[in-house]
Curated annotation (Swiss-Prot):
NCBIfam families: PRK13682.1-3 (NF010228), PRK13682.1-4 (NF010229)
Membrane among keywords: yes
Main location (coarse class): membrane
Pfam families, per database record: DUF1328
Record bears the keyword Membrane: yes
Protein family: Belongs to the UPF0391 family.
This protein's UniProt keywords: Cell membrane, Membrane, Transmembrane, Transmembrane helix
Name this protein carries in UniProt: UPF0391 membrane protein Sbal_1421
Subcellular location: Cell membrane
Membrane topology note: Multi-pass membrane protein
Record-level GO cellular component terms: plasma membrane
Organism field: Shewanella baltica (strain OS155 / ATCC BAA-1091)
Domain of life: Bacteria
Length: 58
């Protein structure tokens, strides 16, 4: 589960960098939406992992 959390975080950061720095100006709106989706998935993944009470696996 922690592995997926890290994947969501990396994808969100990459989407944010591409969308918010002007590198992909035409796709900034799409990058912002993808950024928000993956941030939500990251939070859900962290909450599920916390409520399970299991130690994280890498």
């Amino acid at each position: 589960m922690l592995g997926w959390t890290l994947v969501f975080l990396v994808v969100a950061v990459i989407a944010g960098l591409l969308g918010f720095t002007g590198i992909a100006g035409a796709a900034a709106g799409i990058a912002k939406i993808i950024f928000l989706i993956f941030i939500v998935l990251l939070v859900i993944s962290l909450l599920v992992n916390a409520f399970r009470g299991k130690s994280p696996r890498l």
